[in-house]
Structures are given as structure tokens and as C-alpha cells.
């Protein structure tokens, strides 16, 4: 008799995705981040659910309800710290996952890649509306500044902003709808992740060589289920260590002050994982131009498959492209640093230079290097 996991209508889907899935035998630790992102999402949904049981989405009580969670709810401080720092770990895994896709040419699986970019945008939206919920100073002013950017759109801008605010400023209506979005979006992300996996399993995983690995596949379980488990343990140890030893390391001290529309913080800045995009936004002295650059800084990822000029898939055997890839990583670190600095000389100039380099690498340098490497190998 056939095994139930291969015949049961539901179990055979799980079996095909997580147990008997044919997997390239040589995928490295860089392929762990997909499952780590799944773990992050589950952690965030569970901790978020328990926080939502005690949180009140009203401007008069939101800040106090978060304080109440940390002081009076059993292990509320731990749930909140895991949720807040879990977001940081989520984005670390996201950026590493995207970087892996860029380095090894995984973006040539276009459907998987494009759903991945949409997932990145959804996660960024979720994190943004979530940051507003504690209703501290940086929550309020971050919401005001970022939503205000939509007013840059010609003709409909002002109407659009007031529609999102639910009034003439960031107020109670804004907070309640942001809570609704923050509750809903993670489930949308979970659904989109399933589509992401569905597309991935149509083609199978890429591998570090970029070559076809059909001749050398192994079952996902036990080989990679245990390899993923090691990643799970390492990440959970890291997350709990941060949550227990330095929970406010990555937060902004301004958010310990309740929101006050009459007092603007000296430096309005988002959480660290948005600083690179914030630096690109600020480096353009025109409002609409800045907003478009901000959008394009993420959407440029959708152009990467179309700009692939090399006859090889990954960067494994392409030293020039490797140099450019690491230049892009360094550039993003520079942008992250600049995003957290005040708008004054020399930071403005460095930000503009780094933003130019960011787009030049994506749109000009990487495609040209691919052509150059083809020429060097007489593959043109």
C-alpha cells in the first residue's frame, strides 16, 4: 500500500513541497533564508496576535496600552521585544535572501522573482504601518512625513493624502486604519509566500554553480530539513538574545515620548532597515522626484532579469561582476549610514553620490560587465 503522505490530497501537497521535494545537492547556507523568512513570518504573526489582544488602537490609549503590555501582561515585555526585534531579523533575512538571488542569478526564474519583489514591498508596508501603532513621537512624525509624500502626485495628491489620513492630519482615524492594515497584511504576505513557493517548485531551486542540477538531486527531507533546522536555531538564539539583553538597541529613543503634534523631533528617521531608501528619497531636492526615486529603488529589482546580459547564470565564475555586486552591498551600507544622518554638508553630497552609484550599478554597470565578460570568453 502506498504511503499516506503520497496519496492523501492535502498531505501529498505538503510532501511535494517539504519532504520529497527534489533539491540540488550542492545548495549552500545562502539557500536557508527562504525557510528563515517563513519562521520570521510565523513568529511575527503569533507575537502580533498576542499583542493585539491587549493593544488599543486609539490615540488616547495606544501609548499607555503598550506600556501596560510591558508592565502588567504576563511576559508582555518579552512578546513585545520579540515582535519589535523580530521585524529587524525579518528584514536582515529578506535583504540577504534578495542578495543571494542577485548573486546567483536566481532572478531568471522571473515569476518567483517578481512575486518576491511584491512580497518585499508588502513587508515594507506592513512594517511601516506597524511602526505607527505605539503612537510615540517617531511613530507620529514618521507617519506624517511618509504619508505626506503622496501629496507630490500631481492633481490627486492632496486628496489622496487626506483620504489615507481620514481627515486633515494624522489622527485617530489614521491610527485605527493602520492597525487594521497591520493586522491584515501579514496574512496577505503568507498567501503571497505560498504563490512564491508554487512558482519556485514549477522550476526547482537554482544552485551555486548556476548549472542544471537535474542529474544530482536529493530529497529535501532529511538533508535540508535538518540544515534549515540549524538555521532556525541560530536565528532564534540571535533573536532571543537581542530581545532579552538589548531590546532597544535598534529602536529610536524618541518613541519613548508619547506623540505630540506640536513638537517636531530634531531628526525624523525611520527604522534602520528603511534608511537606505530614505537616503535615496532625501538625496533628490524635488518632492515628486524623491518619491519616484524611493519607489524605483525597490522596483529596480523587477528590471534585473531583463538587464541580465551574461551567458552565465550566477556570479560564481565572474570576478568582475562579483566586484560590482560587493560594490552594491557597500553602497547600500553607505546609504543606510547616510539615511540616519542629519541633512547637512557633507552628508547630503555623500547621499547623492551613493544614490547615483546605486542606480548606475543596477542599470548600467552590471549589464555592461555581463557583455564584457561574454566578449572576454569569446561567447558573443
UniProtKB/Swiss-Prot annotation:
<feature type="binding site" description="axial binding residue">
    <location>
        <position position="83"/>
    </location>
    <ligand>
        <name>heme b b562</name>
    </ligand>
</feature>
<feature type="transmembrane region" description="Helical">
    <location>
        <begin position="33"/>
        <end position="53"/>
    </location>
</feature>
<dbReference type="GO" id="GO:0008121">
    <property type="term" value="F:ubiquinol-cytochrome-c reductase activity"/>
</dbReference>
<dbReference type="InterPro" id="IPR005797">
    <property type="entry name" value="Cyt_b/b6_N"/>
</dbReference>
<keyword id="KW-0830">Ubiquinone</keyword>
<keyword id="KW-0408">Iron</keyword>
<keyword id="KW-0249">Electron transport</keyword>
<feature type="binding site" description="axial binding residue">
    <location>
        <position position="196"/>
    </location>
    <ligand>
        <name>heme b b566</name>
    </ligand>
</feature>
<keyword id="KW-0813">Transport</keyword>
<feature type="binding site">
    <location>
        <position position="201"/>
    </location>
    <ligand>
        <name>a ubiquinone</name>
    </ligand>
</feature>
<dbReference type="InterPro" id="IPR048259">
    <property type="entry name" value="Cytochrome_b_N_euk/bac"/>
</dbReference>
<feature type="transmembrane region" description="Helical">
    <location>
        <begin position="77"/>
        <end position="98"/>
    </location>
</feature>
<dbReference type="GO" id="GO:0005743">
    <property type="term" value="C:mitochondrial inner membrane"/>
</dbReference>
<dbReference type="InterPro" id="IPR030689">
    <property type="entry name" value="Cytochrome_b"/>
</dbReference>
<feature type="transmembrane region" description="Helical">
    <location>
        <begin position="113"/>
        <end position="133"/>
    </location>
</feature>
<dbReference type="InterPro" id="IPR048260">
    <property type="entry name" value="Cytochrome_b_C_euk/bac"/>
</dbReference>
<comment type="similarity">
    <text>Belongs to the cytochrome b family.</text>
</comment>
<protein>
    <recommendedName>
        <fullName>Cytochrome b</fullName>
    </recommendedName>
</protein>
<feature type="transmembrane region" description="Helical">
    <location>
        <begin position="226"/>
        <end position="246"/>
    </location>
</feature>
<feature type="transmembrane region" description="Helical">
    <location>
        <begin position="347"/>
        <end position="367"/>
    </location>
</feature>
<keyword id="KW-0999">Mitochondrion inner membrane</keyword>
<comment type="subunit">
    <text>The cytochrome bc1 complex contains 3 respiratory subunits (MT-CYB, CYC1 and UQCRFS1), 2 core proteins (UQCRC1 and UQCRC2) and probably 6 low-molecular weight proteins.</text>
</comment>
<dbReference type="GO" id="GO:0006122">
    <property type="term" value="P:mitochondrial electron transport, ubiquinol to cytochrome c"/>
</dbReference>
<dbReference type="GO" id="GO:0045275">
    <property type="term" value="C:respiratory chain complex III"/>
</dbReference>
<dbReference type="InterPro" id="IPR005798">
    <property type="entry name" value="Cyt_b/b6_C"/>
</dbReference>
<dbReference type="Pfam" id="PF00032">
    <property type="entry name" value="Cytochrom_B_C"/>
</dbReference>
<comment type="function">
    <text>Component of the ubiquinol-cytochrome c reductase complex (complex III or cytochrome b-c1 complex) that is part of the mitochondrial respiratory chain. The b-c1 complex mediates electron transfer from ubiquinol to cytochrome c. Contributes to the generation of a proton gradient across the mitochondrial membrane that is then used for ATP synthesis.</text>
</comment>
<keyword id="KW-1133">Transmembrane helix</keyword>
<dbReference type="Pfam" id="PF00033">
    <property type="entry name" value="Cytochrome_B"/>
</dbReference>
<dbReference type="InterPro" id="IPR016174">
    <property type="entry name" value="Di-haem_cyt_TM"/>
</dbReference>
<dbReference type="InterPro" id="IPR027387">
    <property type="entry name" value="Cytb/b6-like_sf"/>
</dbReference>
<keyword id="KW-0479">Metal-binding</keyword>
<keyword id="KW-0496">Mitochondrion</keyword>
<feature type="binding site" description="axial binding residue">
    <location>
        <position position="97"/>
    </location>
    <ligand>
        <name>heme b b566</name>
    </ligand>
</feature>
<dbReference type="GO" id="GO:0046872">
    <property type="term" value="F:metal ion binding"/>
</dbReference>
<keyword id="KW-0812">Transmembrane</keyword>
<keyword id="KW-0472">Membrane</keyword>
<feature type="transmembrane region" description="Helical">
    <location>
        <begin position="178"/>
        <end position="198"/>
    </location>
</feature>
<feature type="transmembrane region" description="Helical">
    <location>
        <begin position="288"/>
        <end position="308"/>
    </location>
</feature>
<feature type="transmembrane region" description="Helical">
    <location>
        <begin position="320"/>
        <end position="340"/>
    </location>
</feature>
<dbReference type="InterPro" id="IPR036150">
    <property type="entry name" value="Cyt_b/b6_C_sf"/>
</dbReference>
<keyword id="KW-0679">Respiratory chain</keyword>
Amino acid at each position: 500500500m502506498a504511503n499516506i503522505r503520497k496519496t492523501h490530497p492535502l498531505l501529498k501537497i505538503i510532501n511535494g513541497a517539504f519532504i520529497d521535494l527534489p533539491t540540488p545537492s550542492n545548495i549552500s547556507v545562502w539557500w536557508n533564508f527562504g525557510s528563515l523568512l517563513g519562521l520570521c513570518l510565523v513568529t511575527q504573526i503569533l507575537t502580533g496576535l498576542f499583542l493585539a489582544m491587549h493593544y488599543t488602537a486609539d490615540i488616547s490609549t495606544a501609548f499607555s496600552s503598550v506600556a501596560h503590555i510591558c508592565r502588567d501582561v504576563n511576559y508582555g515585555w518579552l512578546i513585545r521585544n520579540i515582535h519589535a526585534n523580530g521585524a529587524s531579523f525579518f528584514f536582515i533575512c529578506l535583504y540577504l535572501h534578495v542578495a543571494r538571488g542577485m548573486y546567483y542569478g536566481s532572478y531568471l526564474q522571473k515569476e518567483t522573482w517578481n512575486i518576491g519583489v511584491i512580497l518585499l514591498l508588502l513587508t515594507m508596508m506592513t512594517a511601516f504601518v506597524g511602526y505607527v501603532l505605539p503612537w510615540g513621537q517617531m511613530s507620529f512624525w514618521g507617519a506624517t512625513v511618509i504619508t505626506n509624500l503622496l501629496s507630490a502626485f500631481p492633481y490627486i495628491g492632496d486628496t489622496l493624502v487626506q483620504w489615507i489620513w481620514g481627515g486633515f492630519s494624522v489622527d485617530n482615524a489614521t491610527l485605527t486604519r493602520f492597525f487594521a492594515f497591520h493586522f491584515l497584511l501579514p496574512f496577505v504576505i503568507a498567501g503571497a509566500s505560498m504563490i512564491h513557493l508554487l512558482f519556485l517548485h514549477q522550476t526547482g531551486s537554482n544552485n551555486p554553480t548556476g548549472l542544471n542540477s537535474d542529474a544530482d538531486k536529493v530529497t529535501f527531507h532529511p538533508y535540508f530539513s535538518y540544515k534549515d533546522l540549524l538555521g532556525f536555531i541560530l536565528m532564534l538564539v540571535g533573536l532571543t538574545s537581542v530581545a532579552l539583553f538589548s531590546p532597544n538597541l535598534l529602536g529610536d529613543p524618541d518613541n519613548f515620548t508619547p506623540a505630540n503634534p506640536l513638537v517636531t523631533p530634531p531628526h525624523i528617521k525611520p527604522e534602520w532597515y528603511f534608511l537606505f531608501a530614505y537616503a535615496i528619497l532625501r538625496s533628490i531636492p524635488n518632492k515628486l522626484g524623491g518619491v519616484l526615486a524611493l519607489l524605483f529603488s525597490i522596483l529596480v529589482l523587477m528590471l534585473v532579469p531583463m538587464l541580465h546580459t551574461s551567458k552565465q547564470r550566477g556570479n560564481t565564475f565572474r570576478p568582475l561582476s562579483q566586484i560590482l555586486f560587493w560594490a552594491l552591498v557597500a553602497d547600500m551600507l553607505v546609504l543606510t549610514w547616510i539615511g540616519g544622518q542629519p541633512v547637512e554638508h557633507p552628508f547630503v553630497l555623500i547621499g547623492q553620490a551613493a544614490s547615483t552609484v546605486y542606480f548606475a550599478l543596477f542599470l548600467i554597470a552590471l549589464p555592461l560587465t555581463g557583455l564584457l565578460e561574454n566578449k572576454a570568453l569569446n561567447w558573443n
